Amino acid sequence: MMKKNLYSLVLVLAFCIIGSSVYGQESVVLKYNFKEGKTFRMTMSMNTNIVQSMMGQEMKIIADAVSKSEMKFTKVEPGGNATALVSILSISAKTSAMGQEKEENKSDFKKDGISMVFSPSGKVSTKITDTTLSSIESISNMKFFLLPVKEIKIGEKWLDKQIDTMQMQSSNPITFMTTTTDNEYTLAGKEIKDGKELYKISYTGTLEITGKGKQSGMDLFMEGTGQTVGFFYFNPSNSMVIYSESEAEVNTTITVTGQQNMTIPMSQKVKTVMTLEEV
């Protein structure tokens, strides 16, 4: 009897190990499979807490913004590159600083939208935009998480490095800004969200910021570093990232030289939530 029980126990353990091994080998191809004629609506919310010191005084700023954008894929090339017409639907922003609050809401955007070309990795290869967009409209800059465009096993990690240079709005004293990010991604596993079986990808990363500009005849130089942590869900049924959450902490210093020399340290904490729905 004891031998029989031991034999049964060995079989159970063997099946458990085999089952665990099979699950561990499960994989998915992580890339965007854009379809011509498909339309998606993106909602992005950002909560930003800023602490800035200047001339011995500390100033705290809290900003909340919500943007809604819509993108319609009008053309998909044989290699997978897709052209999308991106339209900003609405943006609302609320800022609190020095005991005062300011609200800004806008929904009367141009209907012709912005033409963007995305690769299967989610990278924007071409962007034809309107240079008259205001600073509040720049909040809705639509970007996708970059995917490795290959088969990834659950538990597997991969690295990604991005360098983005932005030409800032004319109202911003910083003329341009370059951001370098290094991220490590992990295919964490499967989860059920809103009745859908999704793949969860978690990530951590570091970033470096440099920029320069002019104001009132003085030169401005900006440097900063930060850390990010977050996750997003990939829906294999439509090959799109449909939800994400991220938190970032960034410390920057703006150095002013010219008629007056000073340094302005600033720390930021930003939480971003994104949802993408097919319409």
Feature annotation, model-predicted:
Residues 10-19:
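Bacterial N-terminal signal peptides
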